[in-house]
């Protein structure tokens, strides 16, 4: 079994891998280059092991994740500035690849051929919620501590890892637009009403509820990858 610094992967007799995100030395999990490297390897591990039926990803901390590490974004922009002085076209390509890395990783997960379920035990923001949306199943703990959001708009940026594509394919258009343009926090009850999560579970039964989704035959295919998929709110028309 591979070893990871930021994740613990355990596969029980049920054939379901439990991926626990628990970054050492941090009070909250965040996406860094290293975290993305490791998650990429875990997706390969789950997909390539015939003994693994699917995976549940959760957090080993009181919160799920705050999203992307802002210092990582600063490094991207710093590297862009350095490369731009040497070769502007190369710098643009590099920035595009770096910015799109998380999007590609989440798409890889949702098309890996194995079902993934996100077990959201606490605050789940930005890129972390986009990761959850890429999972085939989503379960949130029934707790006031659980808040889900795409809050990037509050700091002048827009969700860049698939949230703007997946939310409108799950929720009706009006609710999706309100969420994406306001950065509002969603409680488990509100998120379920918007069809952004599938189940709400007692905190102590969160992981078991997530595993049950896989045992009960959760398909490793997103609704929008099914033939004949239609937006939940119907076609969007303009005047």
PLM features: residue spans?
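Glycine- (often His-adjacent) and acidic-residue-rich active-site loop
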Residues: 59-104, 154-156
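Glycine-rich beta-to-alpha active-site loop
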Residues: 103-155, 179
């Amino acid at each position: 079994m591979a070893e990871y610094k930021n994740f613990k992967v355990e596969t029980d007799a049920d054939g379901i891998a439990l991926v626990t995100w628990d970054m050492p030395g941090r009070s909250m999990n965040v996406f860094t280059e290293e975290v993305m490297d490791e998650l990429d390897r875990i997706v390969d591990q789950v997909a390539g092991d015939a003994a693994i039926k699917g995976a549940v990803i959760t957090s080993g901390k009181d919160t799920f994740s705050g999203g992307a590490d802002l210092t990582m974004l600063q490094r991207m922009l710093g590297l862009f500035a350095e490369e731009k002085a040497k070769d502007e076209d190369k710098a643009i390509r590099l920035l595009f690849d770096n910015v799109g890395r998380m999007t590609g990783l989440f798409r890889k997960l949702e098309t890996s051929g194995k079902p993934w379920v996100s077990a959201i035990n606490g605050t789940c923001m930005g890129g972390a919620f986009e990761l959850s949306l890429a999972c085939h199943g989503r379960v949130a703990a029934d707790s006031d501590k659980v808040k889900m959001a795409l809050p990037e708009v509050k700091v002048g940026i827009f969700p860049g890892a698939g949230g703007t594509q997946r939310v409108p394919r799950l929720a009706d258009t009006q609710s999706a637009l309100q969420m994406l343009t306001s950065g509002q926090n969603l409680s488990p009850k509100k998120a379920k009403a918007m069809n952004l999560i599938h189940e709400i579970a007692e905190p102590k039964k969160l992981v078991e509820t997530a595993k049950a989704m896989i045992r009960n035959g959760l398909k490793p295919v997103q609704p929008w990858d099914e033939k004949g998929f239609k937006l939940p709110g119907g076609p969007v028309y303009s005047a």
